[in-house]
Structures are given as C-alpha cells and as structure tokens.
Amino acid sequence: MRLSDFQDGLASALLPPPGASVPPPAWLDALLAQPGFAVYRNTVAKGCIDALQANYPAVHALVGTDWLRAAAHAFVHKHPPTDGRLMAYGAGFAEFLEGFGPAANLPYLGAVARLDRCWTESHLAADAPALQAAWLAQQAPEALALLRLQPHPAARWQWCAEHPAYTLWQCQRDGLPWDADQPWQGEGALLTRPHDAVQWAPLPHAGCALLDACAAGATFEDAAAQALQADPTADLPALVALLLRSGALRAPETSLN
C-alpha cells in the first residue's frame, strides 16, 4: 500500500463528508473498530471547529458561539484542512456562509468573514519592504506613469458594494457599539502589516480599484485611470498618500539599491 493511499483513507475516515455513501477502505476496518478512534476523530473535528471560531472572531461576535460552531461543523466536513497550521485554516468559509441556509437572513455575513480572512492572510504573509513616499517623489512624471507598482505581500483589501462591511467588522474586532445612524451603504477596507501587527483602515472604492489594477500588473497611469473610473470624484494624491502611509505598496527592487 502506498503511503498516500493510507493518508487519504485515514483523512476520509477522520472527517467524512455529511451523507457520505462510500464506505471507508476495508483495510481501515480494524482501526475504525478501536474505541479510541471515535475519540480521536471527535478531537480532530473539534480542533478544526475551534480554529474556525478563533480565525473568524468578527463573525463569531455577530452570530454567537452556538450558531458559529454549527456552521463550522458543516464546513469542516466539506472542507477539511490542507495545511498543518490551523491558524491558516478557513479559506472559503466566507463563500460557504453565503450559501449556508441559516445565514440567508444575514446577507452581510460573507463580507464580514472575508475581512476576518484578510486579517489572517495579512498576519501570515511574507515580510517585504514597503514603498516609501520619498522614492516615489524622486521619479520623473513620465517614469512614474509607466511604473508597475505591486501591492505589499501583507496588503489585503475588499470592496463590498451592498453593505457597510468594514464598519460591521471593525465594531466586532474593536468591541465598539453599532451606531444606529450608520448609513447602510457599500464600504471598502484595507488591511496591512507595516510592522509587527496587522492594521486596518477604511478604503474607498477608488482605492480598491487602484490596488486591483496594481495587482493585475497595470502601469501606474492605467491603475489611476481605473481608480477614477470606479469613482470620478476620487482624490488620487490623497489616495496614494493613504496607501503609502499604510505600507500597502511594495518597494521596487530599484528603490532598495
């Protein structure tokens, strides 16, 4: 028997999908018959559920422990971990929540979950030097237009057109009360890690569009045009200043020499 076959069989026995009709391989029968196996299986599932609860604190705060753990239980059996670091577990949970029946009356929950995931990805991302305003100011206008700036590896951003996802998320993360006068409108968010801790700030639609364009390899001129297409009233200099202060852009190698 190949090691990979054993690992796949054991994994399917530990976290069988709900309603699975395919029985485990016959060679696993002896293992499954052991009284301790059920305990181990429950421990594995609990560890995954605990990880989701820890990795999605804003969602947890919004829906409560029982609701979240029920949703996590369903997710775990459909999407078992593929990484030994449980802190990284939960990619796809936002999309799962958007199709989860009990969340039908919480249409903003998926967007909030995406911001929780952005925090995790920013926290785990590789270190890299951030672009400095002084270097950018030294570039000639014609050279600046042709620059292909890249988002920092730890930068994450999201635009939610329908819900105030950032304010909802921020209130849960920071323990802030919800403002009854908060307008129910689309919002964007930027998460970065310029030093050791993840930081966050609101980001307008134009800022999200600019970062989307930079991530796709657009020149700075084209990225600026896409930002203005998203919001013709955007203040581009102020927007770029925000991205620089937040460490959202990666320093080109030429700026490090």
Where are these regions (language model features)?
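Low-complexity, glycine/alanine/valine/leucine- and proline-rich hydrophobic stretches
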Residues: P153-A216
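Short, functional C-terminal segments
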Residues: G110, R117-L176
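Long, charge-rich, low-complexity alpha-helical segments
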Residues: M1-A140, D196, A201-N257
